[in-house]
Each structure stands twice: as structure tokens, then as C-alpha cells.
Regions:
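Gram-negative bacterial Sec-dependent N-terminal signal peptides
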Residues: 1-22
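The feature marks the first
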Residues: 26-77
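Sequence context surrounding c-type heme c attachment/ligation sites in exported
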Residues: 35-39, 64, 68, 129-139, ...
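Surface-exposed interaction/gating patches
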Residues: 110, 117-159
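Electrostatic cytochrome c docking/interface patches
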Residues: 21-38, 52-55, 105-132
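The canonical Cys-X-X-Cys-His
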Residues: 34, 41-47, 99, 135-144, ...
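Axial heme c-ligation environment in periplasmic c-type cytochrome domains
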Residues: 52-58, 74-114, 150-156, 174-208
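Stable alpha-helical elements in mature extracytoplasmic
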Residues: 30, 37, 63, 70, ...
């Protein structure tokens, strides 16, 4: 009972701490300059920031603080991906800010369809977590609609490719992705979760709008 109560209190505290998405960007960049610099990005992420490959993320509408944080992580090696690292190495801090503000301002991906057989399980995990293993609810950091928390650099998840999201959860669980830093929040959560839960969650957030 004590463990359950502590879990519920922790989730409630995280939920209260989550800030609403702000209309004005928290990053000092130029969307106009970013548009001119985004030509290379379009090869993988699409001209409008919506990727045709489900293993490459949609970045349209993603918060600028999160995008900058990930570009810096690719550049300094704290997040590994040969293709992205080679691109990030060529970017200055201002380049990153400009690109992030540009993509943040684009309309997010159109609502995708979640697997009807997985919606129930995915929604339960997203909104309620998993008490037995003390896995916090995704809603606490990523918000009711999956819009994320720009100030805390928690990404928007709504409309993201299910295949990409599931892969990131697997990578966090294995430790291959460690860009959650010293908090280890995503590695800890993913490490307590199963493959079935990854798939259900990923499908559910793909269908959020």
C-alpha cells in the first residue's frame, strides 16, 4: 500500500509540474533562417518535417528546446546515430536554434491511426502507468494530448511514427540511448517495461492529436 501511495503521489507531483506548451518559442532562433538551412534535413525528415520512413521521426511541430537538445546530444556524442552525428557536427549553436524554431513552427503530422487492438492497453499505460513495477504514467511528462513540455525539454509524442517511438523505447531499455542524462528517467521507465507495452504505447501515441 505504501509503495502504491508513493507511486501515485510521484505521478501527481510530476503532472502538476508539467507546464503547458507555450505558443512563443523558448529558443532564440530565426524561422526564416532555419527554413533556408533545412534543405538537407528534408532528405530524411521530409520537406515539411513529416518523414515518409516510419523509422525516421516526424519533427514538424516538435518543441524547439527539445530539438536543440537532441542536436547537441548528437554533436557531443551523448546520443549516437552516425547519420545524425555527421549532420550535427556541421551545425553551430545558432544553426541549431534556427532549425529548431523553423520546425517547431510547422504544422505537426496529420493524425495517424492507432491499432484498434492496442488502444486500450496503450491508453491505460499512457494515462495510468503500471503500478506493480512503479512505472510512472507518460501523461505526467508528455501531457494529456502528447504535446510534451517545451520548458522541460520533454518531447511531443502525438502523431509520431509508432515504429520510431517503439525503437526509442527499446534503445532506452537496452541503454543504447542515454540522452535522458543523469536523471535516467526514460531508461528507468523503459527498463521496467515489456516489448508488448512498447508496441501498445507507441501505437497509442501515434493516434493522439
Amino acid at each position: 500500500m505504501k509503495n502504491t501511495l508513493a507511486y501515485v503521489c510521484a505521478v501527481a507531483g510530476m503532472t502538476l509540474a508539467t507546464l503547458q506548451v507555450q505558443a512563443e518559442s523558448l529558443v532564440d532562433g530565426s524561422a526564416e533562417a532555419g527554413k533556408n538551412k533545412a534543405i538537407t534535413c528534408a532528405a530524411c525528415h521530409g520537406a515539411e518535417g513529416v518523414s515518409a520512413n516510419p523509422l525516421w521521426p516526424n519533427i514538424a511541430g516538435q518543441s524547439a528546446p527539445y530539438l536543440v537538445a537532441q542536436l547537441k546530444a548528437f554533436k557531443d556524442g551523448s546520443r549516437e546515430n552516425p547519420l545524425m552525428t555527421s549532420q550535427a557536427m556541421m551545425l553551430s549553436d545558432q544553426d541549431m536554434a534556427d532549425l529548431a524554431v523553423y520546425f517547431e513552427g510547422l504544422p505537426g503530422p496529420a493524425q495517424a491511426v492507432a491499432d484498434a487492438d492496442l488502444i486500450g492497453k496503450g491508453e491505460a499505460l499512457y494515462r495510468g502507468g503500471e503500478v506493480t513495477n512503479e512505472v510512472a504514467a507518460c501523461i505526467a511528462c508528455h501531457g494529456p494530448s502528447g504535446a510534451g513540455n517545451p520548458a522541460a525539454k520533454y518531447p511531443a509524442l502525438k502523431g509520431q511514427h509508432a515504429a520510431y517511438t517503439a525503437k526509442q523505447l527499446r534503445d532506452y531499455a537496452s541503454g543504447e540511448r542515454a540522452s535522458d542524462g543523469k536523471t535516467r528517467i526514460m531508461r528507468d521507465i523503459a527498463g521496467k517495461s515489456s516489448e508488448d507495452e512498447f508496441v501498445a504505447l507507441a501505437s497509442y501515441v501515434q493516434g493522439l492529436k
